[in-house]
A protein has these predicted regions:
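An amphipathic, aromatic/His-enriched active-site/gating alpha helix that lines ligand/cofactor pockets
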Residues: 46-58, 78-132, 144-145
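Sec-dependent N-terminal signal peptides
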Residues: 3-13
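Acidic helix-start/capping segments at beta-turn-to-alpha-helix junctions
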Residues: 57-78
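Intrinsic-disorder/low-complexity, polar/charged segments enriched in Ser/Thr/Lys/Arg/Asp/Glu/Gln
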Residues: 19-23, 74-76
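Solvent-exposed, acidic/flexible segments
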Residues: 29, 33-37, 70-71, 80, ...
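Boundary at the C-terminal end of the N-terminal hydrophobic targeting segment
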Residues: 15-17
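Extended amphipathic alpha-helical interaction segments
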Residues: 137-142
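N-terminal targeting signals for Sec/Tat export/insertion, comprising classic cleavable signal peptides
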Residues: 23-58
Length: 146
């Protein structure tokens, strides 16, 4: 429901022509960095590589916090959608990807479930106002597939 309200807000402020980014802030539980990185590299990244190829998303990034004095989160997962329409369709698009890419569920390191190695703290959804692109950027190559 929260995503629907945010989507309506984005649409009402001319969200159709601007990209939408979803930022997930994740706290990795003590001593479980390896499991978290394995999970995101072998599942989250795979799903987004497929989504980029299908044109469902523009780009994605997984950022690790280098220094956080508050110590609240360790990872920021960023998924960029072309516009609010692609964002609105994201659940259906990713449901299709997950069903075909990992029909038996995600790959896990040490058989730990995600709740055992990470805590999703909060999500922020942003609308791009302006940006720069690297010289090699095209819609077919959004800069991270060099």
């Amino acid at each position: 429901m929260r995503h629907v309200l945010i989507l309506l807000l984005l649409i009402s402020v001319n969200g159709y022509s601007q990209s939408i980014s979803v930022l997930d802030f994740v706290q990795v539980k003590e001593g479980h960095r390896a499991e978290a990185v394995f999970f995101y590299e072998n599942n989250w990244k795979l799903y987004r590589d497929i989504a980029v190829k299908k044109g469902f998303i523009l780009s994605y990034r997984l950022e690790e916090v280098v220094a956080d004095s508050a110590g609240t989160f360790n990872l920021v997962l960023i998924t960029e959608y072309r516009d609010s329409v692609f964002f609105q369709n994201s659940e259906a698009n990713f449901r299709e990807i997950l069903a075909t890419a990992r029909p038996n569920g995600p790959l896990l390191l040490n058989h730990l479930q995600p709740a055992d190695f990470r805590k999703n703290l909060f999500v922020k959804i942003t609308r791009n106002l302006f940006r720069s692109y690297p010289p090699i950027y095209t819609t077919e190559n959004p800069g991270h597939l060099e």
